[in-house]
Amino acid sequence: MTQGKLSVANKAPGTEGQQQVHGEKKEAPAVPSAPPSYEEATSGEGMKAGAFPPAPTAVPLHPSWAYVDPSSSSSYDNGFPTGDHELFTTFSWDDQKVRRVFVRKVYTILLIQLLVTLAVVALFTFCDPVKDYVQANPGWYWASYAVFFATYLTLACCSGPRRHFPWNLILLTVFTLSMAYLTGMLSSYYNTTSVLLCLGITALVCLSVTVFSFQTKFDFTSCQGVLFVLLMTLFFSGLILAILLPFQYVPWLHAVYAALGAGVFTLFLALDTQLLMGNRRHSLSPEEYIFGALNIYLDIIYIFTFFLQLFGTNRE
């Protein structure tokens, strides 16, 4: 008994109080801790786990709410995500590099088309055996016209073949060869001086119109209705001339028609040039490089043929 009393008496002071406190901690129910004071919250002290209730589950945002500024995010480069993406999936004409690549591609194709056509015209103009053969066999002319019309409708009306390689280049090659044959055969009926003169006039006019279209602030793409009316006027004028031609040839009426045609397609050249540039009311998609080259090529060829009818002199 004495030892027991001594053992109890020999306990360190405060031990019994600690056991009581531990017992109270085990038996007392959990009470949520009080929120920290303003000073503790602002100084970062007193921020213990369990001081606040758990955050609610995330609510999915509407796409229009979750806006990210591309210029302030490291995952964007020049407004586009840095991951794998198509170059032209999200296209902006404000990108000067994309515009230059597109215009360069169109004019490269156009240059090849014009060189092929120039070679055919030179062959039909300077080589007498070839010139005599094509004039003696008009069936090739109508066959080339049918091929030209079919390929033109395919490229102009069907976006699938026009945009998919290699069908777009194959169709454009066939179209260019057929149009070159038609232009060369028409040139074979005029003397060499007239052909060279009209080639020079066409080159100067097309170069001037192209530079003007790039520099002017006037938007030709907003005048498509006016150009369509002029084109219909030209079409019906040509139809009337075709009806009157078997009965009587009127030189001045034919000259007016040729001047009207050259003027209309000069305006169309300005329109098609501005469609390549962007920064206008209407612009071509960067996938339409075949369509852009096709339109400008036709404009230049029609300008040349109308100048040939206006200034050319037939061979004797």
Swiss-Prot record:
| Keyword Transmembrane helix appears in the UniProt entry | yes
- Glycosylation positions in this chain: 191
Q: Does the keyword Cell membrane apply?
A: yes
| Residue numbers spanned by region Disordered | 1-53
Q: What is the annotated signal peptide range for this record? A: none
Give the CDD domains listed for this entry: LFG_like
Q: Which InterPro entries match?
A: Bax_inhibitor_1-related
Positions of transmembrane segments: 106-126, 138-158, 165-185, 194-214, 225-245, 250-270, 290-310
Which GO CC terms are listed, alphabetically? endoplasmic reticulum; Golgi apparatus; Golgi membrane; membrane; membrane raft; postsynaptic membrane
Q: Which GO terms describe its molecular function?
A: calcium channel activity
Q: What triggers its expression?
A: Regulated by the AKT1/LEF1 pathway in breast cancer cell lines.
Q: How does it sit in the membrane?
A: Multi-pass membrane protein
Q: Which GO terms describe its biological process?
A: apoptotic signaling pathway; cerebellar granular layer development; cerebellar Purkinje cell differentiation; cerebellar Purkinje cell layer development; cerebellum development; negative regulation of apoptotic process; negative regulation of extrinsic apoptotic signaling pathway via death domain receptors; negative regulation of neuron apoptotic process
Q: Which domain of life is it from?
A: Eukaryota
Keywords, A to Z, come to: Apoptosis, Cell membrane, Glycoprotein, Membrane, Postsynaptic cell membrane, Synapse, Transmembrane, Transmembrane helix
Tissue specificity: Highly expressed in breast carcinoma tissues. Enhanced expression correlates with the grade of the tumor (grade II/grade III) in primary breast tumors (at protein level). Widely expressed. Expressed at high levels in the brain especially in the hippocampus.
Places the protein is found = Cell membrane; Membrane raft; Postsynaptic cell membrane
Q: What does this protein do?
A: Antiapoptotic protein which protects cells uniquely from Fas-induced apoptosis. Regulates Fas-mediated apoptosis in neurons by interfering with caspase-8 activation. May play a role in cerebellar development by affecting cerebellar size, internal granular layer (IGL) thickness, and Purkinje cell (PC) development.
For this chain, the family text in UniProt reads: Belongs to the BI1 family. LFG subfamily.
Listed under subunit, the entry gives:
Interacts with FAS/TNFRSF6 and BAX.
- Protein name as it appears in the record: Protein lifeguard 2
Gene source species: Homo sapiens
Per UniProt, what is the name of the gene that codes for the protein in this document? FAIM2
